[in-house]
Amino acid sequence: IQERYANRLDVKGQDFLRRIVRATQRLDQLLTDILDLSRAQRMDPPVDDIDAEQLVHEVLRRLEKRIKETDARITIRSPLPRLRVNTTWAIQGIYNLVANALKFASAGQAPDIEIAPHSGMDLEGNELIGLVVRDRGPGVAPEQRDRIFELFRRAVGREIEGTGAGLAIVRQVAERHSGRAWVEPREGGGSEFFITFGVNQSSPRKVQR
């Protein structure tokens, strides 16, 4: 419709048509994200033993156009760990974190992103290993640091287009691998987004909320 009729419309009509196209694109992305979240809840057991650096480079390959458009600086703090994961979903989780960092850069500044290894323990003493994605964006207020991982929830004041499902998918991916996903403030400004996976796991964990 846009290609066929755009030249026949006045300025007001063309603006209205552009709004329809943008709304359709947002709806399409929303449906895609909902399907991704549903699939993540039913993902296959983590059967792949893989170097996290391979996952990160695949994510950066997929985001290459956006990285160039934003003139982003990406730093990888090697060595990154080996992970036992479902590769498809681990890539999706890391992709969403890096895409989020690209999207929420501070106004007027090129994104400055660092990807580094992270290890720790959960509350039950189980070993976790994964990645942290650091940015120099506006940060996340303390009261919003958990809610942004809920479906369709976004930080108040972040007036940037999106479906509000990306971080919910990250959390689902982490938890289905007996891990965690969370955010902390970064020293000097910005945020640190973590995605971790259980070291000793044989199948995804079903998380009850």
Where are these regions (language model features)?
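Short helix-loop "hinge" at the ATP-lid/N-box region of the Bergerat-fold HATPase_c
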Residues: 101-105
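A conserved beta-strand-to-alpha-helix junction within the catalytic ATP-binding
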Residues: 46-61, 114
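Glycine-rich ATP-binding loops of the HATPase_c
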Residues: 178-184
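Short conserved segment of the HATPase_c
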Residues: 140-152
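Short alpha-helical Gxxx[C/S/T] motif in the catalytic ATP-binding
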Residues: 166, 170
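Short alpha-helical segment of the dimerization/phosphotransfer core of two-component systems
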Residues: 22-27
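Glycine-rich G1-box
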Residues: 65, 138-139
